Design a protein with these regions (language model features):
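Nucleotide donor/acceptor-binding cores
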Residues: 1, 87, 148-150
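Short structural boundary motif marking the start of a folded domain
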Residues: 1-4, 31
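Extracellular beta-rich ligand/substrate-recognition surface
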Residues: 7-15, 67
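Short gly/ser/thr-rich secondary-structure transition/capping motifs
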Residues: 12-18, 53-55, 97, 134-135
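Conserved hydrophobic/aromatic beta-strand scaffold that supports enzyme active sites
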Residues: 18, 23, 70-72, 106-108, ...
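Glycine-rich beta-strand-centered segment in the early N-terminal region that forms part
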Residues: 22-40, 52-95
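Cytochrome P450 core scaffold surrounding the K-helix E-X-X-R motif
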Residues: 43-49
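NAD(P)H dinucleotide-binding glycine-rich loop of Rossmann-like/cofactor-binding domains
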Residues: 67, 82, 92-150
């Protein structure tokens, strides 16, 4: 599959390159998603630039960046409902704690990180629901019930 990736820190034009990588089949509890869109977050930019305190080199030899995205589930690992095959999903924390994020044609990740996208919501919109959407939910709901407070 085609994937953008980097092996050293720096500005995107200096370190990102198009690569041909193997798409990993899903393990137990995982799904493989054919990505339509990849969302870019400030945390992705900071990670690629090496701007996180105390981090002096990339965590993996080659990193496909980006945490968020959207696409269609194409393959299922054991233990994942067959009903999910073909499901439109949005992805959150795609590149967290692993080398392969959403700047690729496919991503394989835990099924819980591929959330069903409601009808009427485009894949393009789904690609920006991950970190921004979860951040908004935590801001609104983190202080307890919101009933009567709006």
């Amino acid at each position: 599959m085609r994937a953008m990736a980097y092996s050293r820190f720096g500005p995107a034009p200096n370190v990102l390159a198009l690569n041909t990588l193997v798409s990993t089949p899903p393990a137990d509890g995982e799904v493989r998603v054919k990505l339509a869109y990849s969302g870019v977050n400030p945390s992705d930019v900071k990670a690629r630039a090496g701007a996180r305190p105390g981090v002096v080199k990339p965590a993996f030899d080659l990193i496909t960046p980006h945490s968020d995205g959207a696409g269609i589930i194409t393959d299922l690992g054991a233990g994942v409902s067959k009903e999910r095959l073909g499901e439109r999903v949005w992805i959150w924390n795609g590149q967290w704690a692993r080398a392969h994020g959403t700047a690729a044609e496919y991503i394989t990740l835990p099924a819980t990180q591929a959330v069903a996208l409601p009808e009427g919501i485009s894949l393009q919109t789904g690609a920006v629901l991950g970190i921004p959407g979860l951040t908004a939910a935590h801001c609104v709901l983190g202080g307890g019930a919101v009933a009567g407070k709006t």
